[in-house]
Amino acid sequence: MTPTRLTGYAHGGGCACKIPPGELEEAVRGLVGQSGENVLVGLDDGDDAAAVLVGDVAVLSTADFFTPVVDDAYDWGRIAAANALSDIYAMGGRPIVAINLIGWPRDVLPLELMTEVLRGGLAVGSEAGCPVIGGHSIDDPEPKYGMAVTGVADPNRLLRNDAAEPGLPLTLTKPLGVGLLNNRHKQTGEVFAEAVATMTRLNRDAAAAAVATGVRAATDVTGFGLLGHLHKMCRASKVGAVIDRAAVPVIEAARDALRDGYVSGGTRRNLDWVRPQLRTATDVTEDDLLLLADAQTSGGLLVVGELPGHPVIGHIVAGAGIDVR
């Protein structure tokens, strides 16, 4: 029996199927500034999660779901769960409860596969110490899965995307390249174990280390790529940044995928959106920029500060824009 290729049932894959950043910002432009008195982090700066003060605790809320990024149902569930939980970690929080969000083409794909997806999500929730309780399902022509997650944090120690300060280093906690490898997997069926391992690894420990060392600014690198998420942070913080492309960690197989043309449409749209903000050295190539704009799924944390064991890839500067060297 031929295994079911879940990625063949989706027009995009993972966070690469996000609505392009420029279009999304235009769609929500009239919705910013609608905050209540207890809202600590709202929609204005497009941070990773909402934060509301309840008593002396910051309650965090986020939702994230996407179409299949790999063909293995259990791994897709694990990846989607790690990706959803990441928004809580990126704010310096601890997830306390999650609910499933799933769309399933029930007349096309067996429900046993849906069970495997949910089982993968439950496994990662258990690893995170976050109960996964129920959720919501719909009959959907395209399979989709993710979670809505609630977390808690110290309101005085939140990691925010509007708190970057000039002079501080930039650290990245996971390698880039999973977007390229996921696109190659979708088109060829090749399985890249390193990409799956990266996407299923929780950002919990990196976030805890950042909070413990007094970091104030961070975000996670997902569908808008490193350059896109860095641009959002710089814009929110009213600063600029310098990136040393040679210092950016990359899954080695992704370089081959880039050479062979497995660049997603989402990655190209990311680069189109952020290009006006870039200043590049003369030896920086278009392929360099495509790699830095690669649409990640369950990527690492981009931290303004140093974290032991993770590479410094640049620094924050006064001014605006991003220098790529």
Map each language-model feature to its residues:
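Glycine-/charge-enriched secondary-structure boundary and capping motifs
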Residues: M1-G12, E23-E26, E37, R106-P131, ...
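Glycine-rich anion-binding loops of enzyme active sites
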Residues: V54-V70, R78, R94-V191, H315
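Short pre-catalytic strand/loop immediately N-terminal to key active-site residues, enriched for Gly-Thr
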Residues: Y74, V191-T198, R216-A217, D287-L292
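N-terminal glycine-rich phosphate/pyrophosphate-binding loops that anchor nucleotide-derived ligands
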Residues: M1-A90, E165-T171, P311-H315
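Active-site glycine-rich loop that binds ribose-phosphate moieties when present
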Residues: A148-L158, E190-V211, V284
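Small-aliphatic-rich amphipathic alpha-helix that forms the alpha element of a beta-alpha
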Residues: A73-I99, E116-E127, L202-T213, L226-K232
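Acidic-glycine-rich active-site phosphate/pyrophosphate-binding loop
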Residues: A50-S61, T200-A206, L271-T282
